[in-house]
């Protein structure tokens, strides 16, 4: 199989008997490739993973390709407050559910990373709104600048967690897989 890198790869250290977790990343591909170096690890991928010895095993020097679920949409509005309301274009749906974690990018003032979706409102015509909206657990009350961005988008956000059988490093990279190499 041939792998085509998507975005930037990253790494983090892990130790024996403890779950270590990466920083958040926006899901841009349907696969993440994981390599364990220096020690074996059990690996979990998700919004708030905490790997245990019951998760996917990657031997020292071994690799694994694990599935991700991509989801994204354009952003046409942001309402600031102690929680933040993100509005997507009319005629589209919010591709996230309650409990998912998302990242908003492409806006000068309203960007945030890895915040939890608290609710999704898809009702039509309420208070003159026909767009789908979601409430996010992000305090944007300090932002007084109006939202104005033609390039803002919201994407699913995940982390990688590793529970080591010894000490080592996890390298991870989102990839596209194409045929046989």
Predicted regions and their residues:
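Intrinsically disordered, low-complexity Pro/Gly/Ser/Thr-rich segments with frequent PxxP/GP/PP motifs
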Residues: 10-12, 51-70
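Surface-exposed ligand/attachment interfaces on beta-rich extracellular proteins
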Residues: 8-28, 49-50, 81-91, 109
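Short proline/glycine-enriched turn/loop motifs at strand-loop junctions of beta-rich domains
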Residues: 29, 35-42, 91-97
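Small/polar beta-strand repeat architecture
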Residues: 68-98, 103-175, 179-181
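Asparagine-centered strand-capping/turn motif at beta-strand->loop junctions
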Residues: 33-38, 162-166
């Amino acid at each position: 199989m041939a792998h085509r890198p998507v975005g930037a790869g990253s790494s983090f250290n892990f130790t024996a008997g403890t779950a270590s977790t990466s920083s958040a990343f926006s899901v841009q591909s349907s696969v993440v490739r994981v390599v364990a170096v220096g020690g074996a690890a059990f690996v979990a991928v998700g919004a708030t993973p905490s790997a245990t010895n019951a998760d996917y095993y990657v031997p020292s020097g071994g690799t694994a390709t694990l599935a991700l679920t991509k989801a994204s949409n354009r952003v046409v509005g942001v309402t600031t407050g102690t929680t933040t309301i993100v509005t997507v274009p009319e005629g589209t749906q919010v591709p996230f559910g309650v409990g998912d974690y998302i990242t908003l990018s492409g806006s000068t003032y309203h960007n945030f990373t890895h915040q939890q979706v608290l609710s999704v409102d898809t009702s039509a015509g309420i208070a003159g709104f026909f767009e789908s909206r979601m409430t996010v657990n992000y305090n944007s009350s300090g932002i007084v600048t109006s939202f104005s961005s033609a390039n803002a988008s919201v994407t699913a956000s995940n982390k990688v967690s590793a529970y080591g059988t010894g000490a080592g490093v996890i390298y991870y990279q989102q990839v596209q897989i194409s045929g046989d190499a």
